[in-house]
C-alpha cells in the first residue's frame, strides 16, 4: 500500500494504481470520461485534472491528469483547489459546446455519466452562442441506435470495440475538428459484444433500440438481479420490467465472472419473454383439440388426480430447469422413474465434464482465464457457445504484452503505451475446430479438422507431453509438435473444449492434455463448456436412467419439465410420446 496526501488528508491507496483510480477508491469525487476500469487510461478527455505539489514548500503546484499519473509514496495532491476545479469546469464547458442538450428526449437521461459529471463540476451556464457542429447518424442494426451529435470524443467506444472486443467495423474518422465514430457505411455492427457500446459510452451516442421501442426511464423500471440463461457461463445481469413486460437486460458487475461486459445474446436475447404466443396460464387439452384455460389450483388438482389414478408415472427433467425444480420432480416420481432429459450422447459428454470438475485440475472462472499465458482450444466454437469466455480468451492473449510492460517498468493501466510497445506480440493461442473461428485473428496456430481428428490431435498431444508419442500420425505431427512446444514453454497453460461437436472423445482428449500438463507440475487449468445453462446441475442429478428406456417402460403419465422434447428427440421417441395417456408439460415458454 502507498500513502498519499490529498488536500491535507492522508489516504492509503493501492500501490501501482493510477491516481484517478486511487482517488475514486478513497471515496473522492473526481470527474472523468475516457478512463474505464477494464480498459485503462489514455488521457483523451482531460477531465480528471488535479494539482500535484512538488514538496511541502510548493504552494503553487502544477495541473496533471490523474488518470495518467502513478501514485508514489507521500505524493501531495489537491482536488479542491481553485485552479483544478476551474480547469475541470472549463474542460466540460468545452465538451458541451456542440452537445445538443437534449436530455429530456435522450434515452440516457437519468442514468447519464455526462449529466453526473456536469453536475459534479458545477457547470450550469452556457456562454457559447455560435453554431453547433452537427453529424448525420448511421443505421447500426436493429439493436443499437446512433446519435452522433451527443459525442464528446472520449474514444471509449473504439477502444472497447477494436482493442478489447476485437471488432473491425467501427472506427474513428476525423477531419479538422470533426471526429466521427461509426462504420465506413451504414450496416449492422458485426461484433458479438457490440451491445456493450451502450454501457461504455458515457453519453447517449449509442443507445438500446429494443428499449427505445417502449421507452421507460430508469426510475420507472422494476429491476432484479438475475443470471443469464443464454449459455452455461452464468453471467450476472439485471432484468428490468414495466407493466408486466421485460424492457431491458443490463450487465451486472461480478468481478469473478462477467466483469463489466455482457455478450449481445445475453443483453438482447430475452425478447421471447414478451411474445404473445407464450402460454401464460394453465390449460387442459379438450376433446376438440383446443386448450381450455383453467386456474392454477384446478390444474394442480387435475394433475394430482392423474397421478393418483396412474400405475406408472415418469418425470423428464431438463438442463433449462433449475436444480431445485429437477430435484422436486425427482422426489415426486421417484428415483427410478426420473431422467434428466438428456439424450445418451449428452449424458456421456456431461459425465466427462463432471469427472473433470471432481478432479484436482483447476477449472478457472472467466476472470481467471485472463491470467493464463497459453491456451489450447479443442473442438469448441466458444464465440458462439460461450461468448463471454471468448472475450476472456482474447484478453489472455495480451499477457505477452503485460510481460513486456513489466520488463520496461511500464504500468499496465497505460493502455495505449502498452499496446504500442507490444504491437502484434501475443501470448500463444492454439485453436483446432471444424470451422472458422472468430478468435482466429489472435491465434498463434489455427487449424480446421474433423471432430474425430480433433480428438486424435488431443490424445497425441497428451502422449507427447508424457514422452510417449506412439499415437502421432503423419498428418497431425507438425501440429502436435507446435502445440506441445508452446504448452511446454508456458508457465500457466489452459485447455478449453466443450460439447458443441457432440463428440465425447474430444472432451476426454482435452482432459487428458490437462492431466498430462498437471503431471509435469504446470499450473494447469481446464474449461469444458456445457450445452445449456444448467447442464452441469442435472448431470450431477443423473441416475443413469436413459430417456428412451423410460419412455419404453409403458408409463401412464409423463411429466415433462421445461424440456422441448419435440425438437430434441428422434422420430421413435416422438411416436412414444404421442401414445402416452396423460402428458403434463410444465414450462415457462
Which ranges hold each PLM region?
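A basic, amphipathic helix-loop patch mediating RNA/tRNA/ribosome contacts
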Residues: 19-53
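Fe-S ferredoxin-like electron-transfer domains
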Residues: 46-229, 233-237, 242-246
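Short, surface-exposed linear segments at secondary-structure transitions and domain or protein termini
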Residues: 25, 68-79, 257-261, 455-457
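Catalytic alpha/large subunits of respiratory electron-transfer oxidoreductases
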Residues: 96, 100, 147, 154, ...
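Short, structural beta-strand-to-alpha-helix junction motif
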Residues: 3, 17-21, 322
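Short, contiguous acidic and Ser/Thr-rich linear segments
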Residues: 9-17
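Ubiquitin-like/PB1-type beta-grasp interaction modules and other compact soluble beta-rich domains
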Residues: 1-2, 11, 35-37
Amino acid at each position: 500500500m502507498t500513502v498519499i496526501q490529498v488536500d491535507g488528508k492522508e489516504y492509503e491507496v493501492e500501490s501501482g494504481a493510477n491516481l484517478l483510480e486511487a482517488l475514486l477508491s478513497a471515496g473522492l469525487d473526481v470527474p472523468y470520461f475516457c478512463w474505464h476500469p477494464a480498459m485503462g487510461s489514455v488521457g483523451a478527455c482531460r477531465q480528471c485534472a488535479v494539482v500535484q505539489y512538488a514538496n511541502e514548500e510548493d504552494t503553487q503546484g502544477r495541473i496533471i491528469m490523474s488518470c495518467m499519473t502513478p501514485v508514489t509514496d507521500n505524493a501531495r495532491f489537491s482536488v479542491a483547489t481553485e485552479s483544478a476545479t476551474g480547469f475541470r469546469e472549463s474542460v466540460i464547458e468545452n465538451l458541451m459546446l456542440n452537445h445538443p442538450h437534449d436530455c429530456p428526449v435522450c434515452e440516457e437521461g437519468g442514468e447519464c455519466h455526462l449529466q453526473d459529471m456536469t453536475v459534479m463540476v458545477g457547470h450550469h451556464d452556457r456562454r457559447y452562442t455560435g453554431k453547433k457542429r452537427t453529424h448525420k447518424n448511421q443505421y447500426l442494426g436493429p439493436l443499437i441506435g446512433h446519435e452522433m451529435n451527443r459525442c464528446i470524443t472520449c474514444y471509449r467506444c473504439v477502444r472497447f470495440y477494436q482493442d478489447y472486443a476485437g471488432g473491425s467495423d467501427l472506427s474513428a474518422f476525423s477531419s479538422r475538428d470533426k471526429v466521427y465514430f461509426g462504420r465506413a457505411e451504414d450496416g449492422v455492427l458485426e461484433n458479438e459484444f457490440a451491445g456493450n457500446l451502450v454501457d461504455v459510452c458515457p453519453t447517449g451516442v449509442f443507445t438500446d433500440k429494443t428499449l427505445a421501442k417502449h421507452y421507460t426511464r430508469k426510475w420507472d423500471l422494476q429491476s432484479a438481479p438475475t443470471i443469464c440463461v443464454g449459455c452455461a457461463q452464468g453471467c450476472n445481469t439485471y432484468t428490468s420490467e414495466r407493466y408486466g413486460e421485460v424492457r431491458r437486460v443490463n450487465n451486472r458487475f461480478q468481478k469473478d465472472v462477467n466483469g463489466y461486459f455482457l455478450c449481445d445474446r445475453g443483453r438482447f436475447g430475452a425478447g421471447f419473454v414478451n411474445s404473445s404466443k407464450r402460454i401464460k396460464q394453465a390449460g387442459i387439452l379438450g376433446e376438440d383439440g383446443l386448450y381450455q384455460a383453467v386456474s392454477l389450483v384446478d390444474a394442480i388438482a387435475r394433475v394430482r388426480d392423474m397421478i393418483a389414478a396412474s400405475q406408472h408415472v415418469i418425470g423428464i427433467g431438463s438442463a433449462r430447469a433449475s436444480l431445485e425444480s429437477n430435484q422436486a420432480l425427482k422426489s415426486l416420481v421417484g428415483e427410478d422413474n426420473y431422467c434428466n432429459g438428456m439424450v445418451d450422447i449428452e449424458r456421456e459428454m456431461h459425465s466427462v465434464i463432471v469427472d473433470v470438475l471432481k478432479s484436482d485440475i483447476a477449472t478457472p472462472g472467466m476472470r481467471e482465464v485472463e491470467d493464463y499465458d497459453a491456451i489450447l482450444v479443442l473442438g469448441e466454437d466458444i464465440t458462439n457457445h460461450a461468448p463471454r469466455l471468448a472475450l476472456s480468451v482474447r484478453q489472455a492473449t495480451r499477457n505477452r504484452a503485460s510481460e513486456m510492460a513489466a520488463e520496461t517498468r511500464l504500468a499496465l493501466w497505460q493502455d495505449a503505451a502498452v499496446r504500442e510497445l507490444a504491437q502484434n506480440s501475443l501470448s500463444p493461442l492454439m485453436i483446432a475446430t471444424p470451422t472458422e473461428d472468430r478468435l482466429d485473428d489472435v491465434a498463434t496456430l489455427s487449424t480446421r479438422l474433423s471432430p474425430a481428428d480433433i480428438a486424435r490431435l488431443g490424445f497425441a498431444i497428451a502422449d507427447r507431453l508424457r514422452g510417449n508419442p506412439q499415437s502421432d500420425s503423419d498428418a497431425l505431427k507438425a501440429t502436435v509438435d507446435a502445440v506441445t512446444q508452446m504448452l511446454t514453454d508456458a508457465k500457466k497453460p489452459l485447455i478449453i473444449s466443450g460439447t458443441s461437436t457432440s463428440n465425447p472423445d474430444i472432451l476426454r482428449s482435452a482432459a487428458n492434455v490437462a492431466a498430462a500438463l498437471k503431471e509435469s507440475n504446470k499450473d494447469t487449468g481446464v474449461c469444458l463448456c456445457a450445452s445449456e445453462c444448467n447442464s452441469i446441475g442435472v448431470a450431477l442429478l443423473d441416475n443413469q436412467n436413459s430417456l428412451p428406456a423410460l419412455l419404453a417402460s409403458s408409463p401412464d403419465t409423463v411429466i415433462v419439465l421445461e424440456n422441448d422434447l419435440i425438437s430434441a428427440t428422434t422420430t421413435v421417441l416422438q411416436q412414444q410420446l404421442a401414445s402416452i395417456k396423460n402428458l403434463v408439460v410444465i414450462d415457462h415458454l
